[in-house]
Structure formats: C-alpha cells, structure tokens
C-alpha cells in the first residue's frame, strides 16, 4: 500500500544569538531551504525582524535576532528541521506551528504583517518616551549642577 504525503502549511520563528554573523544566518536558512525542498516542500516567505529585546532573558542574553518564515512541507521535514536547529549553537530558540488550512496563507500574512507593524510602532513610541525622559533627566541634572556651582 502506497502512502501519500500531503504538504501542510507551517510557520517558524527562529531566535538566533545576537552575535551571529550574516554568513551564519544565511547558512542556517540555506540548510533549512535545502531540507524543506528535499522533502518536496516549498518556502513561501522568509522575513528578518532584526535584533530585538527578548521578553525574558535567555541565559545572560537580553537580545536576539528574530526570523519568521512560512512554508509548506510534510511532517518528516519538520522533524529534520528541528533536529538540525537543535545542533546549531547559534540558534537560541525556535518554534514550528502548523497553520490552519482553512485560512489562506496570503490572508494569514496580511493579518500577521498588520500586527507586526503595530508592534513596531509601539516599540518606537516606547523608545521615544524613554529618550524624552533621559533628555529631561539630563536637563534637570545640568540645572542642579549649575545651581550648585553658583552656590544657591
């Protein structure tokens, strides 16, 4: 009896060490692409989110390089991808998730990118507020120093 393998949609988020070189990043995803294609799968998208702050530190690391990818493959490809990522020292964390087959991948990515843009906007807003607080603190410190120098 012949078994047929059906490709299912997946997404993966990979967190790499913040000191990973561009070559190491490219090598990882070349290997992943080769693995997926060897199991007759296909990659739909690969996005680099860049270096971001972790929600909780991993060891002593507070930042990681984030990657997001969507692809179609069978379950054997997932097992092989996970095996190769566990071996790689530069991969801190990864998570494969099977996507709902009832939702088209295009529709999923549309909603995902909208959420990602909102998250980036919130992060920029937080950074701007932190910079404003830092500037206000520096100005207050300079004013106190000035008054102290005058002997007030």
Swiss-Prot record:
InterPro entries: Ribosomal_bS6, Ribosomal_bS6_sf, Ribosomal_S6_plastid/chlpt, Transl_elong_EF1B/ribsomal_bS6. GO terms for molecular function: small ribosomal subunit rRNA binding; structural constituent of ribosome. The keyword rRNA-binding applies. It comes from the Bacteria. It holds the Pfam family Ribosomal_S6. Keywords: Ribonucleoprotein, Ribosomal protein, RNA-binding, rRNA-binding. GO terms for biological process: translation. GO terms for cellular component: cytoplasm; ribonucleoprotein complex; ribosome. The keyword Ribosomal protein applies. Binds together with bS18 to 16S ribosomal RNA. NCBIfam families: S6 (TIGR00166). HAMAP family: Ribosomal_bS6. Belongs to the bacterial ribosomal protein bS6 family. This is Small ribosomal subunit protein bS6. The lineage of its organism: Bacteria, Pseudomonadati, Bdellovibrionota, Bdellovibrionia, Bdellovibrionales. The gene is rpsF.
């Amino acid at each position: 009896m012949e078994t047929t393998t059906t490709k299912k949609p997946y997404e993966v988020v990979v967190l790499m060490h913040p000191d990973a070189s561009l070559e190491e990043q490219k090598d990882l995803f070349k290997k992943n692409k080769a693995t997926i294609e060897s199991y007759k799968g296909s990659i739909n998208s690969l996005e680099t989110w860049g270096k971001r702050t972790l929600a909780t530190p991993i060891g002593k690391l507070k930042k990681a390089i984030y990657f997001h990818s969507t692809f179609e493959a069978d379950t054997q490809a997932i097992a092989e991808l996970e095996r190769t990522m566990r071996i790689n020292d530069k991969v801190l964390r990864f998570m494969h998730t099977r996507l709902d087959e009832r939702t088209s991948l295009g529709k999923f990515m549309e909603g995902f990118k909208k959420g990602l843009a909102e998250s980036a906007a919130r992060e920029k807003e937080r950074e701007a507020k932190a910079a404003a607080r830092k500037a206000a603190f520096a100005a207050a410190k300079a004013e106190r120093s000035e008054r102290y120098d005058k002997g007030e």
